[in-house]
């Protein structure tokens, strides 16, 4: 039952991202039990514009580390000239580490 809910949530989120994407690159989030990874992907060209992960960035607990990853990603994106993205949370709820990463990316200058 939990797996079906997760799959439905993922498909619902992806559908919304596809509709909203248009001309904007996608900020994709992957969360494991130890780390969190985020990358900005240009789906038209199939290239990764910027990436950051907690394997490189460390800061206190998992939520603080996720916020540091969001800030690092925003800095890398602004260096490449990316200001607007579509947030792709995947199957993860917008809560905890995912929310901390998104909030820090917004504070860093990304618009979504």
From Swiss-Prot:
Gene3D superfamilies: 3.30.420.100. CDD domains: Ribosomal_L18_L5e. InterPro entries: Ribosomal_uL18_bac-type, Ribosomal_uL18_bac/euk. One of its GO terms (molecular function) is 5S rRNA binding. This is one of the proteins that bind and probably mediate the attachment of the 5S RNA into the large ribosomal subunit, where it forms part of the central protuberance. Belongs to the universal ribosomal protein uL18 family. This is Large ribosomal subunit protein uL18. The gene is rplR.
């Amino acid at each position: 039952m939990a797996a079906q809910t997760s799959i439905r949530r993922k498909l619902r989120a992806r559908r919304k991202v596809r509709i909203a994407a248009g001309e904007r690159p996608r900020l994709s989030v992957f969360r494991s039990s130890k780390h969190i990874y985020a990358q900005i992907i240009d789906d038209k060209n199939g290239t990764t514009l910027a990436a950051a992960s907690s394997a490189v960035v460390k800061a206190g607990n998992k939520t603080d580390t996720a916020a540091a990853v969001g800030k690092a990603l925003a800095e890398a994106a602004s260096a490449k000239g990316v200001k607007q993205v579509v947030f792709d949370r995947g199957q993860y709820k917008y809560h905890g580490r995912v929310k901390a990463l998104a909030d820090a990316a917004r504070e860093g200058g990304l618009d979504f």
